[in-house]
Amino acid sequence: MRRTACLDRTPCPPRRKIPLYKIFPELYNGFTMNKRALDTQLKFGIPKGSLQEATVRMFKKAGFTINIGSRSYFPSIDDEEISPFLLRAQEMARYVADGALDCGITGRDWTIESGRDVTKVCELIYGKQGLRPVRWVLAVPNDSKIRKPEDLQGKRIATELVNATKEYFKNKKVNADIEFSWGATEAKVGAGLVDGIVELTETGASLKANNLRIVDTICESTTLIIANKSSWKNSWKREKIENIALLLQGAILAEEKVGLKMNVEAKNVNKIIAILPAIKNPTVSQLSKDGWCAIETIIDEAVVRNLIPKLKQNGAQGIIEYPLNKVIY
């Protein structure tokens, strides 16, 4: 090892590599860190941007409270074993693959686009506006003569999802000029800077508002939990990630369901059960009052408004509807 000379011309001792957690302790959420602490800390990436609010809400339903400051990239969480970091979904796979993060939440689209090798832990079907997959669509102005992807031969297309778009047109045997867009993609095609765009949409409302027409769907995407390959081999970290995934999946499943319970005379039980569209067979228990039972079940929230009047008409009493935080099978 080469040594530099000190002021008195004698060789200086070799420099020691200082761990990052000692140089930047704020990166580790203010916890006192040593090697043992790092081994029992899960560095978890929270997506910044469109998924941020929905993700924080899902964590809350799963039992975790995340607080994010207006200018902070280091959220706090009420679990000392988790060290969260706020990061754009587009960058998540890169930092997880490189080991800067143990795991994170991002889209399947950005994971594929990055080309990084990560473990896909589970799918979480939620987005900015609802519980459905999102789509990357090929769109053009309403008055464009372009009707099919092949009409874009030799044309210019702007998108953030460059690699997936190139693969799509390659499979179509269409030679188009695909350029990366830093933002305001919908405005570029409206201004005539490009001939078409590939843009993310949940409902299509924004495209319609910008006088754009969908030509085709490039791909669909859902939210994923991804993990670093080495972290996934660590038994403690893997169990922690799997537990978080289980609770988040339960929270998402509960989003569109409610609990329903009621009192029913024994003679009407079979009639009431026949009306209930339960996930599983409803729970029926004997009440202290002879000849009466309590029925409890979980159903889709969308059917409750039509169901309750029918239950009442068929003898159900004391009907209570209540929200659910998690549903885990």
Model segments located where?
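Short, positively charged and aromatic/hydrophobic N-terminal segments
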Residues: K17, Y21-K22, E26-T32
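Small-molecule-sensing regulatory modules
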Residues: N34-E81, L86, T106-C122, Y126-R135, ...
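Short, basic, low-complexity termini and linkers enriched in Ser/Thr/Gly/Pro
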Residues: R2-A5, Y28
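Short, structured active-site "lid" loops
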Residues: S83-D102
